[in-house]
């Protein structure tokens, strides 16, 4: 019998292990991981493909982490069924794992596109370490690649392939890139930077067909244009990994609904990370927030509750820190401008900087900073804490907010004693 059974081995799982061990030093912890690799930093896989970091640098938690925390780690073990009534998880090999408390931290997987001509050699996803190893084996300088999807995953794949010397085209179905976290004005700045790097960007279009016999030779777009390529990367979004829960009785919407303790509607079964449909305090709705920091925090909270230490989540909202060809971007909170919200924009074309905030009910609820990202952390903190803008509103409008403008009590929280001087 496993006191604690965790399905998954990424950010949420490691957070849960640490959460459990802060409360329970002795309970048995078993981790089932579909992947054969140790926990690695998924946001770094594009840097690994580009050759900016080696394989050791992307390991997030090494073997010493599992041994120190007395974790029974089962790599290459995929869970295929959960029975909450019997408190048993069954793996693909038919082995049964009984448990007292269960955490589902299976993350997400790429959306499979139903394209005519799919299944050819040279067609890849770009989501996990195996995808990167496969790409490393086949790509070579001078090749042509098409990336389907202009979101975070697609653009990081495109950047890495371009840095490896490939001729890259990005095809995005929406009117502009990163449409889930940027507005059109900031996306235009990003698109210009990407085009200058040598990557072709096609928006408002789709890939309809993959050409070639056994190998990828090109694609046909919805517009009818044909593009030659030997590598095709599909990066059109992700979905939570919940198919193995089909007969479990655990409810699944867009993700697995959880309460403030990260517990599902089945007692003793918790969920955390990209697989979760949790509370977004800004939109005041349940939603999936598939970002690394949220996954870790949710796992930590789940782990502590599993071990008997009550802890509640205040919810998670979207936030991202990214860079494309040297252009730094930080976003947080709400994107769309709704009734009653004030939008403030500052754009300096000469410095290639863009700043946009949303204010609602005298509180900062959304932010985009591009180029100059100083004080983005302060703004994100203000969003998280729902801090009234008050006298800071004029500073927010001018984009000149810095720590000295914050109340002394807030500076001490953010920066310690040095911050109040």
Indicate residue ranges for each PLM-predicted region.
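FAD-site-proximal beta/loop scaffold in flavoenzymes
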Residues: 119-142, 214-220, 225-301, 391, ...
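FAD-binding core/adjacent interface of flavoenzyme oxidoreductases
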Residues: 1, 5, 61-146, 220-224, ...
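Glycine-rich Rossmann-fold phosphate-binding loop(s) that bind the pyrophosphate
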Residues: 8-11, 127-128, 148-153
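Beta1-alpha1 glycine-rich phosphate/pyrophosphate-binding loop at the start
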Residues: 1-72, 160-182
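Mid-to-C-terminal Rossmann-like scaffold of FAD/NAD(P)H-dependent oxidoreductases
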Residues: 2, 22, 275-376
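A short alpha-helix-loop-beta-strand transition element characteristic
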Residues: 28, 57-58, 252-255, 309-319
């Amino acid at each position: 019998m496993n006191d604690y059974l965790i399905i998954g081995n990424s950010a949420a799982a490691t957070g849960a292990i640490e959460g459990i061990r802060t409360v329970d030093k002795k309970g048995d912890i078993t981790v089932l991981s579909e992947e054969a690799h140790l926990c690695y930093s998924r946001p770094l896989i594009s840097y690994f493909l580009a050759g900016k970091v080696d394989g050791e640098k992307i390991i997030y938690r090494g073997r010493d982490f599992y041994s120190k925390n007395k974790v029974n780690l089962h790599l290459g073990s995929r869970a295929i069924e959960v029975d909450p009534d019997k408190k048993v998880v069954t793996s693909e090999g038919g082995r049964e794992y009984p448990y007292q408390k269960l955490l589902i931290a299976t993350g997400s997987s790429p959306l499979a596109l139903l394209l005519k001509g799919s299944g050819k050699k040279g067609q890849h996803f770009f989501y996990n370490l195996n995808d990167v190893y496969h790409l490393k084996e086949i790509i070579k300088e001078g090749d042509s690649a098409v990336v389907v999807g202009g979101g975070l995953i697609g653009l990081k794949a495109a950047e890495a392939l371009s840095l490896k010397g490939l001729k890259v085209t990005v095809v995005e179905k929406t009117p502009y890139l990163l449409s889930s976290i940027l507005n059109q004005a900031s996306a235009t700045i990003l698109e210009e930077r990407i085009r200058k790097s040598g990557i072709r960007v096609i928006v408002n279009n789709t890939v309809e067909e993959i050409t070639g016999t056994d190998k990828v030779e090109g694609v046909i777009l919805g517009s009818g244009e044909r593009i030659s390529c030997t590598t095709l990367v599909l990066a059109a979004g992700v979905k939570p990994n919940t198919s193995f829960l089909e007969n479990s009785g655990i409810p699944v919407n867009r993700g697995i609904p959880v309460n403030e303790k990260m517990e599902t509607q089945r007692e003793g079964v918790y969920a955390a990370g990209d697989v979760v449909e949790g509370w977004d305090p800004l939109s005041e709705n349940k939603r999936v927030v598939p970002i690394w920091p949220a996954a870790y925090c949710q796992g930590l909270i789940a782990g502590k509750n599993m071990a008997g230490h009550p802890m509640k989540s205040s919810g998670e909202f979207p936030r991202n820190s990214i860079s494309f060809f040297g252009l730094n971007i930080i976003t947080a909170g709400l994107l769309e401008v709704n009734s009653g919200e004030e939008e403030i924009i500052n754009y300096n074309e000469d410095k290639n900087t863009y700043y946009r905030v949303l204010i609602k009910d005298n509180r900062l609820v959304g932010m985009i900073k591009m180029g100059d990202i100083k004080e983005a952390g302060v703004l994100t903190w203000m969003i998280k804490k729902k801090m009234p803008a008050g006298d800071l509103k004029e500073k927010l409008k001018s984009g000149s907010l810095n720590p000295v403008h914050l109340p002394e009590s807030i500076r001490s929280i953010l920066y310690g004693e040095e911050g109040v001087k």
